[in-house]
């Protein structure tokens, strides 16, 4: 028996920006908030931390690299809630700048999670999004920087209003293949594997927003990519300028856009403002 209670889900939520987004949604969202994390133990510890603050998130395991794990979460949401109101795709990985893992392996591993994992979550969970639902894909300003460092022909493809999901997948796979062959620089790619994966997330968001316009126009679902800023997390390190709480502001703003909001939709948003892509 599914409850009609609204529900919000945050992925990669056991620490950093994801944890801060979950905390803020627990305070502001009128419904249940599901904290999803790959590691059950760390996820439960994060839930206990929030419970100690008087908040009551629910936990569900989610490894976005594992299609079975995504489907288990989908089934849970359908059974318990009959759908999903807010989806925040925050889970992602990055290698440290000084990591000596070969670049092609960094490219493959980062792409698998940041782009393909996020895409798989969208594939399974977007059909569950209820009318006036909100979807937020956490991208990065690094994607904009990486875009500007791509060869012009690649930039034009990534900025195209008509690029298809299949074409985008082809380009993401080509980047990984080019790194394996050691030709990514001469093929016009930038030197940031993380940056290219986040170009993928931003462009995927534009494509999915367009699909929602075509297939579910009357449902007023808003889907955006955003940059939380340079945030002090395990990923970005201690020198970053924003706290995780400050990093959560834009994702939470997009997750809680009022029901009558016309936009933003299909945009790249930073500091609550639409950035030109």
Swiss-Prot record:
<dbReference type="GO" id="GO:0004090">
    <property type="term" value="F:carbonyl reductase (NADPH) activity"/>
</dbReference>
<dbReference type="InterPro" id="IPR045313">
    <property type="entry name" value="CBR1-like"/>
</dbReference>
<dbReference type="GO" id="GO:0047021">
    <property type="term" value="F:15-hydroxyprostaglandin dehydrogenase (NADP+) activity"/>
</dbReference>
<dbReference type="GO" id="GO:0050221">
    <property type="term" value="F:prostaglandin E2 9-reductase activity"/>
</dbReference>
<keyword id="KW-0521">NADP</keyword>
<feature type="binding site">
    <location>
        <begin position="95"/>
        <end position="97"/>
    </location>
    <ligand>
        <name>glutathione</name>
    </ligand>
</feature>
<dbReference type="GO" id="GO:0016616">
    <property type="term" value="F:oxidoreductase activity, acting on the CH-OH group of donors, NAD or NADP as acceptor"/>
</dbReference>
<dbReference type="GO" id="GO:0042373">
    <property type="term" value="P:vitamin K metabolic process"/>
</dbReference>
<keyword id="KW-0560">Oxidoreductase</keyword>
<dbReference type="GO" id="GO:0008211">
    <property type="term" value="P:glucocorticoid metabolic process"/>
</dbReference>
<comment type="similarity">
    <text>Belongs to the short-chain dehydrogenases/reductases (SDR) family.</text>
</comment>
<feature type="region of interest" description="Disordered">
    <location>
        <begin position="258"/>
        <end position="277"/>
    </location>
</feature>
<feature type="modified residue" description="N-acetylserine">
    <location>
        <position position="2"/>
    </location>
</feature>
<dbReference type="Pfam" id="PF00106">
    <property type="entry name" value="adh_short"/>
</dbReference>
<feature type="binding site">
    <location>
        <position position="90"/>
    </location>
    <ligand>
        <name>NADP(+)</name>
    </ligand>
</feature>
<feature type="binding site">
    <location>
        <begin position="231"/>
        <end position="233"/>
    </location>
    <ligand>
        <name>NADP(+)</name>
    </ligand>
</feature>
<keyword id="KW-0963">Cytoplasm</keyword>
<feature type="binding site">
    <location>
        <begin position="194"/>
        <end position="198"/>
    </location>
    <ligand>
        <name>NADP(+)</name>
    </ligand>
</feature>
<keyword id="KW-0597">Phosphoprotein</keyword>
<dbReference type="GO" id="GO:0005737">
    <property type="term" value="C:cytoplasm"/>
</dbReference>
<comment type="subunit">
    <text>Monomer.</text>
</comment>
<dbReference type="InterPro" id="IPR036291">
    <property type="entry name" value="NAD(P)-bd_dom_sf"/>
</dbReference>
<feature type="binding site">
    <location>
        <begin position="10"/>
        <end position="34"/>
    </location>
    <ligand>
        <name>NADP(+)</name>
    </ligand>
</feature>
<feature type="modified residue" description="Phosphoserine">
    <location>
        <position position="30"/>
    </location>
</feature>
<feature type="binding site">
    <location>
        <begin position="193"/>
        <end position="194"/>
    </location>
    <ligand>
        <name>glutathione</name>
    </ligand>
</feature>
<comment type="function">
    <text>NADPH-dependent reductase with broad substrate specificity. Catalyzes the reduction of a wide variety of carbonyl compounds including quinones, prostaglandins, menadione, plus various xenobiotics. Catalyzes the reduction of the antitumor anthracyclines doxorubicin and daunorubicin to the cardiotoxic compounds doxorubicinol and daunorubicinol. Can convert prostaglandin E to prostaglandin F2-alpha. Can bind glutathione, which explains its higher affinity for glutathione-conjugated substrates. Catalyzes the reduction of S-nitrosoglutathione.</text>
</comment>
<feature type="binding site">
    <location>
        <position position="106"/>
    </location>
    <ligand>
        <name>glutathione</name>
    </ligand>
</feature>
<feature type="binding site">
    <location>
        <begin position="63"/>
        <end position="64"/>
    </location>
    <ligand>
        <name>NADP(+)</name>
    </ligand>
</feature>
<keyword id="KW-0007">Acetylation</keyword>
<feature type="modified residue" description="N6-1-carboxyethyl lysine">
    <location>
        <position position="239"/>
    </location>
</feature>
<feature type="modified residue" description="Phosphoserine">
    <location>
        <position position="2"/>
    </location>
</feature>
<dbReference type="InterPro" id="IPR002347">
    <property type="entry name" value="SDR_fam"/>
</dbReference>
<feature type="binding site">
    <location>
        <position position="140"/>
    </location>
    <ligand>
        <name>substrate</name>
    </ligand>
</feature>
<dbReference type="GO" id="GO:0006805">
    <property type="term" value="P:xenobiotic metabolic process"/>
</dbReference>
<keyword id="KW-0443">Lipid metabolism</keyword>
<dbReference type="GO" id="GO:0047020">
    <property type="term" value="F:15-hydroxyprostaglandin-D dehydrogenase (NADP+) activity"/>
</dbReference>
<feature type="active site" description="Proton acceptor">
    <location>
        <position position="194"/>
    </location>
</feature>
<dbReference type="InterPro" id="IPR020904">
    <property type="entry name" value="Sc_DH/Rdtase_CS"/>
</dbReference>
<dbReference type="GO" id="GO:0160163">
    <property type="term" value="F:S-nitrosoglutathione reductase (NADPH) activity"/>
</dbReference>
<protein>
    <recommendedName>
        <fullName>Carbonyl reductase [NADPH] 1</fullName>
        <ecNumber>1.1.1.184</ecNumber>
        <ecNumber>1.1.1.196</ecNumber>
        <ecNumber>1.1.1.197</ecNumber>
        <ecNumber>1.1.1.71</ecNumber>
        <ecNumber>1.1.1.189</ecNumber>
    </recommendedName>
</protein>
């Amino acid at each position: 028996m599914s409850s009609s209670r609204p529900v919000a889900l945050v992925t990669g939520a056991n620490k950093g920006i994801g944890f801060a987004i979950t905390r803020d949604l627990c305070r502001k969202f009128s419904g249940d908030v599901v904290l999803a994390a790959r590691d059950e133990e760390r996820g439960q510890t994060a839930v206990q931390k929030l419970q100690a603050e008087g908040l009551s998130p629910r936990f569900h395991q989610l490894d976005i690299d594992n299609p079975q794990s995504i489907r288990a979460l989908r089934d849970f949401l359908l059974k318990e809630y009959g759908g999903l109101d807010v989806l925040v795709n925050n889970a992602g990985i990055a290698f440290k700048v000084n990591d000596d893992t070969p670049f092609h392996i960094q490219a493959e591993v980062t792409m698998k999670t940041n782009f393909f994992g996020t895409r798989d979550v969208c594939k399974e969970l977007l059909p569950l999004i209820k009318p006036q639902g909100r979807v937020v894909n956490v991208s990065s300003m690094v994607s904009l920087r990486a875009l500007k460092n791509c060869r012009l022909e690649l930039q034009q493809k990534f900025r195209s209003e008509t690029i298809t999901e299949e074409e985008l997948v082809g380009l993401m796979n080509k980047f990984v293949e080019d790194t394996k062959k050691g030709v990514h620089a001469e093929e016009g790619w930038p030197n940031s594997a993380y940056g290219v994966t986040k170009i993928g997330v931003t462009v995927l968001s534009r494509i999915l927003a367009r699909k929602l316009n075509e297939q579910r126009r009357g449902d007023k679902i808003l889907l955006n990519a955003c940059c939380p800023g340079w945030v002090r997390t395990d990923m970005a390190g201690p020198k970053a300028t924003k706290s995780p709480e400050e990093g959560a502001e834009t994702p939470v703003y997009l997750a809680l856009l009022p029901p009558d909001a016309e936009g933003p939709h299909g945009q790249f948003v930073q500091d609550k403002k639409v950035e030109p892509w």
